[in-house]
Amino acid sequence: FGSLLGICLMTQIITGLLMAMHYTADTTLAFTSVAHTCRNVQFGWLIRNLHANGASMFFICIYLHIGRGFYYGSYLFKETWNTGVILLLTLMATAFVGYVLPWGQMSFWGATVITNLFSAIPYIGQTLVEWAWGGFSVDNPMLTRFFALHFLLPFMIAGLTFIHLTFLHETGSNNPLGISSNCDKIPFHPYFSTKDILGFLAMLVPLTALAMFSPNLLGDPENFTPANPLVTPPHIKPEWYFLFAYAILRSIPNKLGGVLALAASVLILFLIPFLHKSKQRTMTFRPLSQLLFWILVTNLLILTWVGS
């Protein structure tokens, strides 16, 4: 899935650059500029749909990639694993700030709710929120800085990807048995290159199908309404890939407790290398660990379903 994530990143950067050329980071113009891109720019609709649904593909791939690393004990490459977790956090930040840019109803209220979470931090919380907003409400200053961040972060992700790969090349990659694969090494081309191209097709075909046939399947219909600070949507919820964390946040009645649980749900990944106590690296021959692993997966799926 690593190669797929690389392709995702490249696709997102290319489609994103093409859209940034037609986007205006201003509260009065953002929504109309996106509509203009879809209506009047050559293939603008396709570029936008690929970009929006490409994010979903990105998260599908990264969750599968993390799950596989978890199953096969790849977290024992500590540096690779930790840079990977940092990559995940950066990706989540990028997706969040990007979601705000079209300035639809859910963009606006999602931004309001999530930035407000910072106010749960004792002492500095309120100051932090006003600093993030650039004022006393979600308005133009925040939109412009979110656009700047959304432009910047993908390049940071690209840089971190190289660090991630450099650490991986120090050790070589893992395999399902968790043993040294030096005796099984084969040329990258044509073997791995063919395997990767198959993966690219398996991802890009559903992505183009989604972008062409039902581009709004995963989106929120509220975002067809321009942002209105005076009308709260009936259900404020993020895109599907954040629902598990959002469900955790919402399930805790205390604000600070919810924020901590939300953060912990992702940051727990940093602890995994220290929790490995088995003599075997992978879960291939560990039925009990497998059971716990699949319970975790089911939990995440249930949280995602409950969150919506």
From Swiss-Prot:
Cofactor stoichiometry and binding remark: Binds 2 heme b groups non-covalently.
Cofactor: heme b
Record localization: Mitochondrion inner membrane
Binding site for heme b b566: 65, 164
Alphabetically ordered keywords of this record: Electron transport, Heme, Iron, Membrane, Metal-binding, Mitochondrion, Mitochondrion inner membrane, Respiratory chain, Transmembrane, Transmembrane helix, Transport, Ubiquinone
Binding site for heme b b562: 51, 150
GO cellular component, one term: mitochondrial inner membrane
Protein's GO biological process: mitochondrial electron transport, ubiquinol to cytochrome c
Top-rank taxon, per record: Eukaryota
Molecular function terms from GO: metal ion binding; ubiquinol-cytochrome-c reductase activity
PANTHER family documented for this protein: CYTOCHROME B
Subunit structure: The cytochrome bc1 complex contains 11 subunits: 3 respiratory subunits (MT-CYB, CYC1 and UQCRFS1), 2 core proteins (UQCRC1 and UQCRC2) and 6 low-molecular weight proteins (UQCRH/QCR6, UQCRB/QCR7, UQCRQ/QCR8, UQCR10/QCR9, UQCR11/QCR10 and a cleavage product of UQCRFS1). This cytochrome bc1 complex then forms a dimer.
Record family assignment: Belongs to the cytochrome b family.
Note: Heme 1 (or BL or b562) is low-potential and absorbs at about 562 nm, and heme 2 (or BH or b566) is high-potential and absorbs at about 566 nm.
Function: Component of the ubiquinol-cytochrome c reductase complex (complex III or cytochrome b-c1 complex) that is part of the mitochondrial respiratory chain. The b-c1 complex mediates electron transfer from ubiquinol to cytochrome c. Contributes to the generation of a proton gradient across the mitochondrial membrane that is then used for ATP synthesis.
Name by which UniProt lists this protein: Cytochrome b
